Amino acid sequence: MKKNYLITTGGSGGHVIPATILYDHLEKKANVIISTDKRGLKYLNKDIFTLEIINTPKLNNILFLPLTFLSILFLTFRSILLLKRKKIKKLISTGGYMSLPLIFAAKIFSLYIYLIEPNQVLGRANKFFLNSCKYIFCYS
């Protein structure tokens, strides 16, 4: 039986393109789903990839911060349902704020979390979850 993997990505091509390459590699031996936000959709073909949309709001507007935290809480609950429904065993994140709800949900289920850092400097989301991950993959 194939394992179920979820790759969470979104935002810019710098996050999404590595996720698509990993998807192509893993789909030969596992069931793979990509979760992205609306911005990441422009880099993904719905006919090629199995997709789930988790549209996490940006964390950059201090006036809407309480609403943003409520939204992330709601999306974490939605992510819990997704992980359970799809029987996900491992979560791979390319970082970014859009990965927050899914990684929180994966922590609740004690799933293996793998982080990919596509930049030379560790991003804030990956730094936040560094102690929760099984491995972090970086470019050299």
Question: Where do the model's predicted regions map?
Answer:
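Active-site-proximal region of nucleotide-activated glycan assembly enzymes
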Residues: 31-33, 39, 107-140
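Well-ordered beta-strand positions
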Residues: 50, 90, 134-135
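Histidine-centered beta-alpha loop that forms part of the nucleotide-sugar donor binding/catalytic region
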Residues: 10, 96, 117-120
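Conserved nucleotide-sugar phosphate-binding/catalytic loop shared by glycosyltransferases and other
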Residues: 2-10, 28-71
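An aromatic- and histidine-rich active-site surface loop
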Residues: 39-42, 90-109
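Short, glycine-rich nucleotide/cofactor-binding loops
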Residues: 7-15, 91
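An amphipathic, basic-hydrophobic alpha-helix
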Residues: 61-90, 100, 108
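Short amphipathic alpha-helix
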Residues: 15-26, 39
